[in-house]
Amino acid sequence: MEFMGNRPFICCRRHALRLLLLAATAAVRPAAGWGQARPAPADATHRIQVDVPLLADDPVAVPLTVSVDHPMEPEHYVRSLEVTLATDPVPKKGTFLFTARSGRASVAYQMRSGQGGELTVVAECSRHGRFETKQTVRVAPGGCAVPAGTAARERGGSPSVRLDARVKPGEAVPVWASLKHTSHTGLVEKKGAFVREREPYFVERATVFLGDERVSEFLLTPAISPDPKLRFFVRTEAGQGLRVVFVNNRGERWEASQRLT
């Protein structure tokens, strides 16, 4: 028995081990508030749905739909969906921003993929932060590059927007927006490596307005397929004006509009 001051101090091995374990656990636990994405929670409202072919025949136009069946209310909604494919020459596949007026956090489009791999989709909830899911996609090679020496034609025009259903008060309505616009990454493949041969040409942003209110914005990359076509949702009332503004990476701008009925 040892003494500390005038009181006996008994060293218990079991108690000491327990303290060591608690200290080790605290040392490796991440600090709260880092903002890192975590695996999607088990509840249905925070489950990211990814629809992409396991094997895509055309690497220049891989169809992809990402969505979260989540409330879209002013105090609780999905702010964004971010798509990446880390193994690709152009890894960022798009960031899609939503508001409560979007009605549904969902987007469908076509992307380029150079070699496929593990697709990562990160969602951000206004109340619960970021969460993610992963899904494997396989593609034929060559979607992110053009043969060396090939001159890619560059042109854009003919924007369009159309509704996929009649407007019902308070419900999210599917919308298709498209633009005739060529695109390329500016990359060529030489000796097994991707090399930037010229500046890319692509649609880099599509912004959705109801009247003068911005309700969604889609930030695109050189991985967007030629002649982009996007499907998304809006929550609106009959009689409002819907506008979609496309802007490419050279600042050229196109606009399509439709009165909702």
Language model features with spans:
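N-terminal secretory signal peptides
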Residues: 1-12, 19-30
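Beta-strand signatures of extracellular beta-sandwich domains
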Residues: 80-84, 205-209, 245
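Short edge beta-strand/loop segments characteristic of extracellular beta-sandwich folds
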Residues: 63-71, 174-180
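Aromatic sugar-binding surface patches on proteins
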Residues: 101-107, 223-231
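N-terminal edge beta-strand
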Residues: 39-59, 152-169
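Extracellular Ig-like/FN3 beta-sandwich strand-entry sites
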Residues: 114-118, 239-241
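Short acidic/polar inter-strand loop motif in beta-rich domains
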Residues: 125-132, 248-255
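Extracytoplasmic/periplasmic copper-protein system
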Residues: 36-42, 132-162, 256-261
